[in-house]
Amino acid sequence: MTKQGFPAPDFDESINRVGTHSSKWDTMERLYGVSAADGIAMWVADMDFRPPNCVQRAIEKMAAHGIYGYYGDDAEYLAAIRWWMETRHGWTVPTEAIFTTHGLVNGTAICVDAFTQPGDGVLLMTPVYHAFARVIRCAGRDVVECPLDVTDGRYTFDTADWQERITPKTRMMILCSPHNPGGRVWSQDELRAVADFCVKNDLILVSDEIHHDLVFPGERHIPMPLAAPDIQDRLVVMTATTKTFNIAGAHSGNVIIPDPKLRERFAARMNALGISANSFGLFMATAAYSPEGAAWVDALTSYLDGNRRLFDEGVNAIPGLRSMPLEATYLAWVDFAGTGMTTAEFIGRVQKGARIAANHGATFGLGGESFLRFNLATPRARVEQAVERLRLAFGDLQ
């Protein structure tokens, strides 16, 4: 049992996802040349764990009823979101500020459409979640890449560099907080610097906070509205149950917009696109944002903390490899620059030698070229196996 009195989840359970239309497991051979028969899928950012029992019960209740109509009367769903943000993050969210989209990427696309024009620039601090650049370019906007600095092995901001790279046509910044793939939890001072930069340059700030619940002991995520309450007239915050509770297939997300004028613009674009809620996602989210869901998240972050410690210790003992310190997320960011190998060489050793599928760092933009991203949200035995395979694949460098 958890300390809150709920059944303890078994994250050590090995669940075979092959043959279930899993993007993570059923496409890795085609994309990475790693067979599911003996390979380890550590790329797509979903977890190999069952969601909390409260989520399972919500789906079972829907199935037992047997009618899957349009969703209506969202008061309970909105109350669950507000309860979660208040109790877990100390953030009081007005009901009228909440919009429901089909997920983070969909929410990003609507923001780009609603708040910029074709030919405008959108600033990204790279390396960063690769879907942002894709959405921006597909919308006919320009990606303004601003590489993050590295200080004492961690990513940091260089606002002076941002100032040199933007143009009068740069209209928006997308912040990843906590950061994917670098695992940073930005400090109050860092978030304040972002806010000040956006005010100075009249930018809309879209803050992707989808990993806000997956923060490790000793770190504290600060929602941007609390870090910089004076910028609410230019702020959009995106969150979701999908990452926290491993229900990405539900395709639902929350877009929280404090300012009424920005809400009007966002709502107009949503209506033009005919976007409405996924009833499965809303039922699951309502169940997840609960005391039982909170107990599950506490158990999850404790388990993931053990996985990251095991992975970091093992990988950092391999000559030439360095895992960036992970403060949040379950996505380890490993630098292979110390091997002296070309990108093709170290990727070949990981995929063909270690038989591991991991995200290629170059897809995350400038600064990611020497990295691979490894998903640690899997049973610990599999993490141990991955570390041992990497040790053998790069053993000749010792």
Identify what each model region corresponds to.
Residues 20-32:
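Glycine-biased, low-complexity coil/linker segments
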Residues 2-12, 18, 33-40, 45-61, ...:
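PLP-dependent class I/II
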Residues 62, 69-102:
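Conserved N-terminal alpha-helix of the aminotransferase class I/II PLP-enzyme fold
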